Amino acid sequence: TAGGGVITPPEGYWQRVQEICRKYDILLHIDEVVCGVGRTGTWFGYQHYGVEPDMVTMAKGVASGYAAIACLVTSEKVFDLFKDDASDPMNYFRDISTFGGCTAGPAAALENLRIIEDENLLENTQQMGTYMLDALTDLMGRHKVIGDVRGKGLFLGAELVSDREDKTPMDEKKV
């Protein structure tokens, strides 16, 4: 999450969540609105953790902010729940909305995804993310107000603290 301070999960966290979801027949939904579509150096942030969500939501990154678009992508298992006749691939729930027929968002998204792929931007994100994480780590070594740096790819954060030992957050007025 970005709003929470670019908190990265501990090793095994997502695998455990998926295990619990499977055990109790709960659908695993992962929100990739902030960290998806290349920001972490893979198409989706969850790909770093070896899980297979049932549903993934994404928005901003799909068209790099050039057009308003949001998506819900599901597994085939979830998609089949919306079919009246599971044997007919065209017999599914359809939702019509005010802007449902507008092709600007999908066109921008398709072009954006093509550019990300053609220009190897995932690889670039990995390389630049390593460079930036190293630079932030170097800054942390020289400035006691940086208590931690973390993240993946270019989805990074630096935690500002007034005391590095106990990680007391920096007073907002000083920031």
Regions found by a protein language model. Give the residues of each.
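Conserved N-terminal phosphate-binding loop of PLP-dependent enzymes in the Aspartate aminotransferase
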Residues: 1-175
